[in-house]
From Swiss-Prot:
Organism lineage string: Eukaryota, Metazoa, Chordata, Craniata, Vertebrata
Gene, per the UniProt record: FASTKD3
GO CC annotations, alphabetized: mitochondrial matrix; mitochondrion; nucleoplasm; ribonucleoprotein granule
Any Pfam family matching the protein: FAST_1
Name of the featured protein: FAST kinase domain-containing protein 3, mitochondrial
Localization (cell): Mitochondrion
Length: 662
């Protein structure tokens, strides 16, 4: 009875022309049948076990059974295909009711065993249905993670018979069946060098050269070849050329994203394809509303890789639709969206609000790399989001062990940059200090310096670690193989040293050698100060000239001996009279005007950035009377007279000063 069942199952694959194979098996005992099938099929079947590195798996009938880590098959670091969906595209190609019923039943099956059991009951199995069965097996296995097929499925005679006919007679398959089978087998981690995949790829390339493949099949084939590292850009160029001849209006959203990903694989020829890319970018505006979260993240990633900064209308529209998908993105998809927004410098209030809700709700379950990208997004765009920062601080305190040294640095740096201390600041920095004590040498030198400098911006001075970073050994590590230490690192070291002198007088450790110090924190490439807003300065200068009577009574952009540049300096004598800016004697008080434009504040609030807060703090400790002139106060003044009165109140609140009439 068992032999009849096996023969029946194999016979029902009639469209694969299996009658001759059955005739040969007909007179053999059952154990011989299983032995023959296994010995023929096992050399090219491949399974991935849940191991972090490449593995090999052998069993009694499969001496050549071999698997590589699936990560090796993903050169672009993203999901392999733009859409591996519910067999819908195959169902569209089927005309008769019986076949449509097959696909409906297939889509309801939830395990590989159910799929194989179902197809074993079929009287006939056309190639499109066989390919659909493979694809459904792929889909249900992927739901449990990227781990390949279990041993019991690989050894199932129905599954082996399916694969055997795909290997033996690929020329008999339809275009859709061919590329669908190739797609599914790749996702099931069949060995790229197996005769099965080599035969399928060769047949695909042969049909590609002949032309006439449909758009969807070309897109699937292109992504398959990318995954296999097959044929380089030569075959992909042929696919791109054929797709260029098609009307974009006939492409589905999945096809458009696949096209982006194919172009993404040929970045060295992006200039040659730019005209085509411009056409795709413009057309994509019409399909954004139909993109799934996965497709949106893939399109954004492709735009980054292809450096499509000029496609800003598309980026803005994608950003608009990203907002509604924030709750539904996977960790990986959210990470890619954030990377794209960081790359293009895009942000908006609605996305930030959606991100706040997502992070606050699930921060403890977010992948560490996603948490770092969220913090980098806030840091790059200068977004002070208290819900996000508070949630991340709580996550770090509760789950410190899941973050690497590099990630800890990336996670903590925005707190200093945005000049914000969360409610659990004491627990946060106590936990950080413990990590630094135990893992100090595991931190990359530059990441460590950024981390400690960020703490100092927030008045959380890393006194216990200053002695270590000022030592020549650490400074040599920081310099690495370069001929000299970079300007930014020297500036951060200098500001840490200045903070130790001004704010930590009890620190008695090593000092920073003069050769590692900078003369000014205001440098063109990597400044620790924000240059004064030129338009705002000109407006204030007019008011000061009217208030003080002449231009000679104040000096602009004064570099102090302590590396800081003062926007405007005013000198007073002991009686409070204003001295000429050139005076060097009888100076009783120096006023430092900080003309703070929008770039000195967080982008979404009137909260001063960390680097400006430490500057004003240090100037006060150095004896300056710091007077802040923020842009939002200046913007409310309606006349020059109001400006002069405003400056008088700021500078000389207790004195009577006369100014010139307008």
């Amino acid at each position: 009875m068992a032999l009849i069942t096996l023969r029946k199952n194999l016979y029902r694959l009639s469209d694969f022309q299996m009658h001759r194979a059955l005739a040969a098996l007909k007179n053999k005992p059952l154990n011989h049948v299983h032995k023959v099938v296994k010995e023929r099929l096992c050399p090219w079947l491949c399974s991935r076990q849940p191991e972090p590195f490449g593995v090999k798996f052998h069993h009694a009938h499969c001496k050549k059974f071999h698997s590589k880590n699936g990560n090796d098959l993903h050169p672009l670091g993203g999901p392999v295909f733009s859409q591996v969906s519910d067999c819908d595209r195959l169902e569209q190609n089927v005309k008769n009711e019986e076949s449509q019923m097959f696909y409906r039943r297939l889509s309801n099956l939830t395990s590989s065993e159910e799929v194989l059991s179902f197809i074993s009951t079929m009287e006939t199995l056309p190639d499109t249905m066989a390919a659909g069965a493979l694809q459904r097996i792929c889909e249900v296995e992927k739901k449990d993670g990227d781990q390949g097929l279990p041993k019991e499925i690989l050894e199932n005679s129905i599954f082996q018979a399916l694969c055997f006919q795909f290997e033996k007679e690929p020329s008999q398959l339809s275009n859709t069946s061919l590329v669908t089978a190739l797609q599914a087998l790749i996702l099931l981690h069949v060995d790229p060098q197996s005769s099965l995949l080599l035969n399928l790829v060769a047949e695909c390339q042969n049909r590609l050269r002949k032309g006439g493949m449909e758009v969807r099949n070309l897109c699937i084939l292109g992504e398959s070849l990318i995954t296999l590292h097959s044929s380089g850009c030569v075959t992909l160029e042929l696919i791109i050329n054929q797709l260029q001849g098609e009307k974009l209006e006939t492409f589905t959203p999945e096809d458009i994203v696949a096209l982006y990903r194919i172009l993404q694989a040929c970045t060295e020829k992006v200039d040659e394809h730019q005209t085509f890319l411009n056409k795709i970018n413009n057309f994509s505006l019409s399909i954004v509303s139909n993109l799934s979260p996965k497709l949106i993240s893939q399109m954004l990633t492709a735009l980054v890789v292809l450096d499509q900064s000029q496609a800003f209308p598309l980026i803005i529209k994608l950003g608009k639709y990203v907002v509604r998908h924030v709750p539904h993105f996977t960790n990986e998809e959210l990470r890619r969206v954030l990377e794209a927004f960081i790359y293009f410098g895009h942000h908006d209030t609605f996305f930030t609000k959606a991100l706040e809700h997502r992070v606050a709700a699930v921060c403890l379950t977010l992948d560490p790399e996603v948490v770092c990208r969220v913090m980098e997004y806030c840091s790059r765009e200068l977004i002070l989001s208290k819900p996000i920062l508070n949630a991340v601080a709580e996550t770090f305190v509760c789950q410190t062990e899941k973050f690497s040294p590099r990630q800890i640095s990336a996670l903590m740096e925005p707190f200093g940059k945005l000049n914000y201390l969360p409610p659990n600041a004491s627990a946060l920095f106590r936990k950080l200090e413990n990590v630094l004590f135990t893992h100090f040498n595991y931190f990359p030198p530059k990441s460590l310096l950024k981390l400690l400098h960020s703490c100092s911006l927030n008045e959380c001075h890393p006194v216990n670690f200053l002695a270590k970073i000022f030592k020549p050994l650490f400074l040599q590590r920081l310099q690495g193989k370069e001929s000299h230490l970079d300007t930014l690192s020297r500036a951060q070291l200098t500001q840490l040293f200045l903070a130790s002198v001004l704010e930590c007088p009890f620190y008695k450790g090593p000092k920073l050698l003069p050769k590692y110090q900078v003369k000014s924190f205001l440098t063109p490439c990597c400044s620790l100060e924000t240059p004064v807003d030129s338009q705002l300065y000109r407006y204030v200068k007019i008011g000061l000239t009217n208030l003080l009577g002449a231009r000679l009574y104040f000096a602009p952009k004064v570099l102090t001996p302590y590396c800081y540049t003062i926007d405007v300096e005013i000198k007073l004598d002991e009686e409070g009279f204003v001295l000429p800016s050139t005076a060097n004697e009888d100076i009783h008080k120096r006023i430092a005007l900080c003309i703070d434009g929008p770039k000195r504040f967080c982008s979404n609030s009137k909260h001063l950035l960390g680097k400006e807060a430490i500057k004003q703090r240090h100037l006060q400790l150095l004896g300056y009377q710091v007077v802040q002139i923020p842009y939002h106060e200046i913007g409310m003044l309606k006349s020059r007279r109001e400006l002069v009165e405003y400056l008088q109140r700021k500078l000389f609140s207790q004195n009577t000063v006369h100014w010139l009439q307008e």
